[in-house]
């Protein structure tokens, strides 16, 4: 059972074979060799019994990777760098991208491995859980066993920088105060919301006020609001006791669940809205959420990292980005369609960059 709040081996899964038939009729009678006997039962105290004299007749003992080790190995080492030119003029086909995407391990958390009493009441989806090694722990309230729990993970950004983002689920009625506690604790100055409140069914509760409201010990006020064609920007203040901080809230609603926007332009404009001097100056992570906190959330974070790679290096490793995201929070980027759209969006961004200098 794992309860960690903040560990991130790759190897091929070897197959063991004993080769051809090893029993041959001896020309003369010889003492029969003892067979190698292996008895192993999970959870039992049965011993491993080997005739050491017979070890030379079989293949050398080697370690066998567990599926978990294989998953981590893939996510830590896989990559497919694409230059700006390749991304624009010779991109992988949709079929190739689908095949590539389907090979990426999801790295979802087994509910049995999340040993946190009462967490289920704070999970919007019972199978979408925070990976233990990178989960956010609330540190202020200590009155209950599960008081540190929120369904959220720290996410690395460009060049592997730690805690650039927090990916989380859309707040629920009983987690709104926890959400604002996380915003305060982590000194968050930007929240990016990528879902509507309802899309057939509830995806997220209305966790900010129309004017002013208290959520637990935090007083939230709306200071300003600007409507853009694809998104709405609100300037908020969050106050705790005598201290007051500013938080920018961006609601991008033109993105259907499990799908992609109609075009890549609005998403790139959203990324540009985030790229401000204020964002760069703030040391706290950017909170990003949709409903489950993995699909649209993963696409936005991957798009921003991809833009930064293209601008700085002239190439982008989208496969490597998604693998890094899934190490931090399982299931980031939910569908092959989203993976294909990510390539399309970054190809459009590459075309907008200044021409590369001649070698």
From Swiss-Prot:
- According to the UniProt record, where is the region Interaction with MAP kinases? 38-51
One GO MF term, please? protein tyrosine phosphatase activity
Q: Does the keyword Cytoplasm apply?
A: yes
Which residues bind substrate per the record? Answer: 257, 290-296, 334
Tissue and organ distribution: Expressed in bone marrow-derived mast cells.
Catalysed conversion reaction: O-phospho-L-tyrosyl-[protein] + H2O = L-tyrosyl-[protein] + phosphate
Give yes or no: UniProt keyword Transferase.
no
Cysteine sulfenic acid (-SOH): residues carrying this PTM: 290
Provide the positions where the record notes the PTM Phosphoserine: 44, 93, 143
The protein's matches in SUPFAM superfamilies, at most eight in alphabetical order, are given as: (Phosphotyrosine protein) phosphatases II (SSF52799)
Function text: May play a role in the regulation of T and B-lymphocyte development and signal transduction.
Q: What is this protein called?
A: Tyrosine-protein phosphatase non-receptor type 7
Q: Which organism is it from?
A: Mus musculus (Mouse)
Which lineage ranks, top first, belong to the organism behind this chain? Eukaryota, Metazoa, Chordata, Craniata, Vertebrata
